[in-house]
From Swiss-Prot:
GO terms for cellular component: cytoplasm. It comes from Leptospira interrogans serogroup Icterohaemorrhagiae serovar copenhageni (strain Fiocruz L1-130). The gene is hisI. InterPro entries: PRib_AMP_CycHydrolase_dom (IPR002496), PRib_AMP_CycHydrolase_sf (IPR038019). The lineage of its organism: Bacteria, Pseudomonadati, Spirochaetota, Spirochaetia, Leptospirales. This is Phosphoribosyl-AMP cyclohydrolase. PANTHER family: HISTIDINE BIOSYNTHESIS BIFUNCTIONAL PROTEIN, HISTIDINE BIOSYNTHESIS BIFUNCTIONAL PROTEIN HIS7.
Length: 187
């Protein structure tokens, strides 16, 4: 198994408010689960590189609106969580200085793809854009939250949110009631 870093979001239920964001190595995930309170739920994104742990005991973070860049170095990346107006978590990606600048300037979400090593505007090819309503940051300024108006779907699998399944005991998946707005074309 290749070692990769994954993003962990603790989410307060039932409000689905973000309580924390941290990055760990994938092989540390089973040990991380052992530190969580009994009765947590686990939702996983389509690429299996971001995990939401949901529990009533997680305390939500305080967020403030921001119009400033979090990064000023060309090589730095900051986690960015996209949510809709109701607070539903749509996806998690990364931003660099250029993507943040374009997001602020255009009002549409731009990200930096680590796998392609390039800047991208969400929806540039699909038309499934994210119009930014506001940009939030926790008081420690460790990541950004783009509250967006999502066109069609955030997930390349056709789901409104990338978090459309819950991991059950072991490796069993349960589909969540997340609308699937299109079927992706097979290549």
């Amino acid at each position: 198994m290749s070692s990769r870093e994954i993003t962990i979001l603790k989410i307060q239920e039932p409000t689905r408010s973000i309580a924390s964001l941290t990055r760990i190595m994938e092989e540390e995930l089973s040990q991380y689960r052992k530190t969580l309170p009994k009765g947590f739920r686990e939702e996983v994104d389509c690429d299996e590189d971001t995990v939401l742990f949901l529990h009533v005991d997680f305390l939500p973070l305080d967020f403030q609106k921001t119009t400033e860049l979090l990064l000023t170095g060309k090589k730095d990346l900051v986690p960015v969580v996209a949510i809709d107006l109701q607070g539903q978590i749509l996806m998690q990606a990364f931003g660099n200085e250029e993507s943040q600048t374009l997001s602020l300037k255009t009002g549409y979400a731009h990200y930096f793809s680590r796998s392609r090593n390039q800047l991208w505007k969400k929806g540039d090819t699909s038309g499934h854009t994210q119009k930014i309503l506001q940009i939030l940051s926790p008081t420690d300024r460790s990541f950004l939250v783009y509250q967006v108006e999502q066109e069609v779907a955030a997930c390349h699998e056709g789901y409104y949110s990338c978090f459309f399944r819950e991991r059950m005991e072991g490796v069993t998946w349960k589909l969540l009631p997340v609308p699937r707005n299109f079927l992706p074309e097979k290549s």
